[in-house]
Amino acid sequence: MAIYGIGTDIVQLSRIAAVLERTGGRFAEKVLGPDELRVFHARRARSEARGIAFLATRFSAKEAFSKAIGLGMHWPMTWRALQTLNQRSGEPYVVASGELADWLAARGITARVTVSDERDYAVSFVVAETDAPPPAPAPVPRTLP
C-alpha cells in the first residue's frame, strides 16, 4: 500500500454547538449520515455535551478525509456520503456510500481515521492509502548559489 494522502482537522466545540443551536438541529441532519445521526441522537439524549462532541468529531473527520483524498468538500465527497463509525472496541473506521464509494473503489483507496475530543476541541487525522502504484515524484528544482 502507498499513501495517497493525509488530512487533519481541528474544530472548536463551541462553534459546533452554536451552529447546531442556530439551525435548530438541522446542521446535524445535513452533516451526518444515517448511522451517525442515530448515534448522535442517542448520545445527545444522555448528555448535550457528549452529543456536541460526537457531532464535532464526525464533522472534523469528514473535513480531514476530504483533505486526504485531495478533493475538499467537492463532488463526490459530500457530507452524508462518508460516515465515521466505531468498532465494538471503540476504534473508528470510515464507510463511504454512493458515488464517493465508487470513486474510491476506482482508485483503490482505503482510509484509516482517528478522532479525539477534549474540553474545547475535536481533532481528526486521516491516512488515505491506495494499492495503485504511486506517481513518480516531481523533480525538485535546483537553485544556484
Curated annotation (Swiss-Prot):
Keyword tags: Cytoplasm, Fatty acid biosynthesis, Fatty acid metabolism, Lipid biosynthesis, Lipid metabolism, Magnesium, Metal-binding, Transferase
MF terms in GO: holo-[acyl-carrier-protein] synthase activity; magnesium ion binding
Pfam families according to UniProt: ACPS
Needed co-factor(s): Mg(2+)
Chief location category: cytoplasm
Residues that, per the record, bind Mg(2+): 9, 63
Catalysis performed (reactions): apo-[ACP] + CoA = holo-[ACP] + adenosine 3',5'-bisphosphate + H(+)
EC number(s) on file: 2.7.8.7
GO biological process, one term: fatty acid biosynthetic process
GO CC, alphabetical: cytoplasm
NCBIfam families in UniProt: acpS, pantethn_trn
Family per similarity comment: Belongs to the P-Pant transferase superfamily. AcpS family.
Function summary: Transfers the 4'-phosphopantetheine moiety from coenzyme A to a Ser of acyl-carrier-protein.
Protein name: Holo-[acyl-carrier-protein] synthase
Organism, as annotated: Burkholderia vietnamiensis (strain G4 / LMG 22486) (Burkholderia cepacia (strain R1808))
